[in-house]
Regions:
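Conserved N-terminal subdomain of the carbohydrate kinase-like
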Residues: 39-41, 63-141
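Glycine-rich phosphate/adenosyl-contacting loop at the front of the ribokinase-like
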Residues: 1-71, 81
């Protein structure tokens, strides 16, 4: 394990890194059963987490001390504000800001046996625009 930790300490990027992808909100709730048509069930909230594969990678790179250009669309709205504030607390910023629309979120229902069911609401992270990509600073090979 020591050898692995030492390798991580010496890790560095040989080329500029760009992280391209989504930042979303995960609302996680315990459910005694999945809802069926016409029912009304009580949920117990476990937590609200900021997620998305690209955001998780951006956080990991930051912790490793690797500078990255983060292209994670952040919009305007309740969810976007939560994402923007969470990123700022970790000194992360996105090079992509959507003019309109909020970020997406996911409701994860967790049954007593641990099985998870997801209901996702797409936001600006799924509305990519060519001008966002054109504005990124990605050097040629």
């Amino acid at each position: 394990m020591k050898a692995f930790a030492q390798r991580l300490e010496n890790l560095h990027a040989t080329r500029p890194v760009t992280v391209l992808g989504a930042a979303v909100i995960d609302v996680i709730a315990d459910a005694y059963a999945l809802p069926w048509r016409g029912c009304d069930i009580e949920l117990k909230q476990q937590g609200v987490n900021i997620g998305g594969c690209a955001l998780n990678i951006a956080i990991a790179l930051k912790r490793l001390g690797i500078t990255a250009q983060n292209a994670l669309p952040v919009g305007h709205g309740v969810w976007a504000d939560i994402i923007r504030n969470a990123m700022a607390k970790q000194d992360l910023h996105s090079a992509v800001e959507a003019d309109t629309g909020d970020n997406g979120w996911c409701l994860a229902l967790v049954e007593p046996d641990g099985e998870r069911t997801f209901m996702s609401f797409s936001g600006v992270e799924n509305q990519w625009q060519q001008r966002w990509l054109d504005a990124l600073h990605v050097p040629q090979n």
